[in-house]
Amino acid sequence: MSAPESPHEFLRRDEYLGPLVEEHGELTVEPANDFFERFVVSIIRQQVSMASATATRERLFEAVEVAPEGILAADDEVLQDAGLSRQKTTYVNNIAETFVEKGYSREYFVEMSDDAIRDALTEISGVGPWTADMQLIFSLGRPDVFPVGDLGIRKGMVQLFDDLDRRDRTAMVERSQRWAPYRSYASLYLWRATEA
């Protein structure tokens, strides 16, 4: 099956997402300028409010060079003073070590499938399926990722489909197939739907 000309034209025709596309305009999925920085920001955002994540991000970016070498050169105390928990400090160090050891970059993953990338990233201690999916969408700009592990996605699905149980992830993934090959774009609209 060939991909439709535009994700927005495709989703605009969907009876459920079409109104959200009209309301919010053309939301885009693009690769991040810096894969490693975006990865670190995803770790910062795990299980905290956006305000807390933003404050920690600002302090961390002021305290150290947010690159694999910069993170590895920094004392854990410096990372924790910037607002990272001990656990997140360990995770960020694990990611930095893996990037250095394996040569990870956006280019490294270009030819790999989403599943292969997800498998590679979740081998890093501290990186689960949610974080891997966020990297696929926001770091690598992959167009067809459906992060069903995200609470906002599940809330958005229940909002759109009143017959769905918020705990039934399998049914949500099946229902999301209607938006393939643009489920990353659909996810952006699902998140927007829950912000209202």
Regions found by a protein language model. Name each.
Residues 27, 61-196:
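Catalytic cores of DNA base-excision repair glycosylases
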Residues 2-6, 13-16, 56, 153, ...:
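Alpha-helical structural motif
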Residues 1-31:
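Intrinsically disordered, low-complexity, charged terminal extensions of DNA damage-control enzymes
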